[in-house]
């Protein structure tokens, strides 16, 4: 499948190759830098609806993230492998991308410190990031924005049907926080699993039915598995002494 089709462009391979942006070994001048974290690889994000040669997207593999806790090796390989592939897809769709591997000599191994030198090197006057799902990173980027002082664009990840503040607004002043209420409001608002104003099936939930066991004749569908060769990533982790737990077949990574 052509890379651009994976990103939703629906164009042929020859056109993809014609407009693929080169790798930026040394960041060229840019007006704006946008940070993409490892769990924000959303090809459908509104950031990517337009190609802007003055915007530089940045992804980075940093010890800050591999070392704050011991992670399973499959998790680290999965993150780095997906990040590298996503960077390739962005370039193939005409976006400028700077990708810092863990072993890049310019890599300070800190997200804020890397952002500082990238901003200085490119001359960018503004930067942006998508809201992290983890409090630790959310606070770090808020602190960096306050200290750095440059105008910052904070965007939603657009991963979910709600924004970060909607749940709090829904339950404001309520004594009980019931998932049932949230679930119903979301279905009414989005039209998902609805026939007009009524729920599909005639009732709002089937909790009682779902507690039953599946029939003995039920055969679960096989999992969707892949076969990625991430031996280069594993060798890099080992060479630089990144401590992980668990084992992995890096030559046939299944996710």
Predicted regions mapped to residue ranges:
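Extreme N-terminal basic, low-complexity initiation segments
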Residues: 2-7
């Amino acid at each position: 499948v052509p890379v651009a089709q994976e990103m939703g462009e629906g164009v042929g391979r020859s056109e993809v190759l014609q407009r693929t942006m080169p790798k930026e070994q040394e960041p060229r001048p840019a007006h704006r830098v946008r940070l993409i974290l490892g769990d924000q690889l959303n090809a459908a994000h509104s950031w990517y609806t337009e190609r802007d040669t003055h915007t530089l997207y940045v992804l980075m593999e940093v010890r800050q993230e591999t070392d704050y806790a011991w992670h399973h090796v499959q998790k680290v390989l999965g993150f780095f492998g997906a990040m590298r592939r996503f960077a390739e897809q962005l370039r193939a769709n005409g976006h400028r991308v700077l990708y810092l591997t863990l072993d890049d000599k310019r890599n300070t191994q800190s997200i804020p410190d890397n952002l500082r030198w990238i901003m200085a090197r490119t001359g960018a006057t503004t930067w942006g990031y998508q809201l992290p799902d983890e409090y630790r990173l959310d606070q770090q980027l808020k602190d960096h924005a306050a200290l750095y002082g440059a105008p910052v664009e904070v965007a939603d990840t657009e991963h979910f049907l709600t924004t970060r503040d909607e749940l709090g607004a829904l339950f404001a002043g309520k004594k009980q926080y019931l998932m049932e209420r949230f679930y119903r409001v979301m279905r009414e608002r989005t039209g998902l699993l609805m026939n007009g104003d009524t729920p599909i099936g005639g009732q709002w939930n089937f909790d009682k039915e779902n507690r039953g066991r599946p029939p003995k004749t039920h055969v679960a569908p096989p999992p969707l598995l892949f076969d990625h060769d991430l031996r280069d990533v594993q060798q890099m982790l080992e060479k630089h002494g990144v401590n992980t737990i668990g084992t992995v077949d890096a030559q046939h990574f299944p996710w």
